[in-house]
Amino acid sequence: MDIEELKRRLIAEVIDREGGYVNHPADRGGPTCWGITLQVARDNGYQGDMRALPRPLAAKIYANRYWHSLKLDDIAAMNRDLAMVLFDFGVNSGPGRAAEYLQIQLNVLNNRGRHYADIKVDGAVGEHTLTALRKHANIRGESGLFLLAHTVNAERIVFCRRLAERSESQEAFTYGWFRRVVELLSHVLHQRPVPREWIDEVAA
């Protein structure tokens, strides 16, 4: 499938997995619908009842906030596994954090600056981050990008564990978080049958 179809399918799968309205008492993000938190919905101009958040609007938010902000069209052109990891990481923990972990991994993989210069860990994927990623790909090849995808994904386990250690209430979600991360690159999550119309309604 092409990159546009990959983006649409991943967004539709997240919406399907997250489901409709949820207001878990331990969720610090408050009520969600289709996985979109109240604050994110408000930030994107939605002022209605979260129970009525339109699914096409949720899809648009996922595309803009979690795909395009991380430059995942560019990254998917290099390695789709890495794009999938960063998208799911962004959805689960915020796009800024996903970008930071990518930048940290690139900095420790540059052989003390011999392969490319360190980049600023600022949580924003821009030209410096993409240039470092391209240089990493040129030097290490496809296997290097595959390794990078796995190392970023592995860091998520540590991040989620620390959340639960700091706040016992978050243990309500720990098993699900761990399972989500572990299953991601086995593509278990990406074999979910979702309605074709959900995929098609994701805006380009």
Spans of features found by a protein language model:
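Cell-wall polysaccharide-cleaving catalytic domain and substrate-binding groove, primarily
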Residues: 1-204
